[in-house]
Amino acid sequence: MSSKINKFILGYWSTKGLGSASRQMIIYAGIPLVAKIYKVLPKEENGEIIYEGSSWHDNDKINLKNKNSLINLPYLQFIKDNKEFVISHSNTCLTFLGKELGMFGENMHEELECEQLLQESVDLRNIVTKFAYTHFHSEEDELQAAKEVFTSAFENSNSGKLQKFEHWLDTKDNNLLKTFLVGNNISAPDFNLFDTLDLYKKFLFHYNFVKDAKDENIFELAGFPLVSDFFNNFIQLPKLQKYINSELYKLPFTNKGAKFGSGKSGITWDPAIDTDTTPEEIIIE
């Protein structure tokens, strides 16, 4: 019989980013997590401030590359059946954790649903992430790009990404809960969609795309009541509260070089006033 994993090491930058959903899954499952944190640091180059990742590239990456030539952030490191494993790439981590922790469907049909929904949530995230890491020549250009993100994600038509999830929840079998995307149980795409929606919530508020909204109704006012219920139910799940109350949930959504979602004192990281005090390891048991 295969042994259970009694601890995960998950390495990622000092942001939520592509490591957040995997962190959540481990904590939700009640398995001890050692979150290894790597920081990008500012340096001046040709009169401009850029950010370099030597804390990762010149340190742990060198040793881990001997164990996995494909190593990148995020990575998972664990012992199973007396053998060490190091795996990389965000979707691989999510899929592995889903299957290992019983969060990837109850049968082949549900597993295929998990695969599709996970990819769809990645597509939804990529729209706003590309925007977040783009530095625009003017405020006018930024606002125009923000409107395009809003249209791509929130247009309530066949081309809008979020309407796919609304329709998915709407057409679920009436005998199944709408609390989760697949069946009656939590699965990997739930975590990735929640994390992506959390970023979009910040985006909607910052650019004031939904008037007179509050945390609990912003997606409903945007035209997605079932997605709104999903988000509100998910963030209140009892097993998720250890993550919600941890330092990991307080991390910025994007890394310091991003224009949107990276700041501590504002929407953009400002090296003149912001300080990254995240510890090198965050242990949650």
Task: State each model region's role.
Residues 109, 116-236:
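GST-like fold's C-terminal all-alpha helical module
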